[in-house]
């Protein structure tokens, strides 16, 4: 059985927006993907926020209603699920984010890495930094 995938926000966004600079590598990954791919509440919110942000959308922000339709389009694909916050998530999140210095940019990445690990999923991203968490990653280029 193929391991399921957990794309980060930027992968979902690149898939959703044909004009995105990383749309082609995201689409190439998506077209070859046969396993389940999952959203978390954080990746859902991130996608909805980016789709409705003019600067992220080249001045052409979607309405909230349109953004919901894009998200719904992903969920209508039989490969897409919402992955639950499993009990293991909390301990993993604390371990990945428990640094001895203030590092505000670590919170979201640590959460995404923990969510992928707790759900035994491959974290799919454009960001090489996810490798530092020791979770299984697929870095798109």
Predicted regions and their residues:
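Short, well-structured N-terminal submotif of metal-dependent ribonuclease cores
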Residues: 1-39, 54-69
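Positions that flank functional sites
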Residues: 45, 89-90, 131
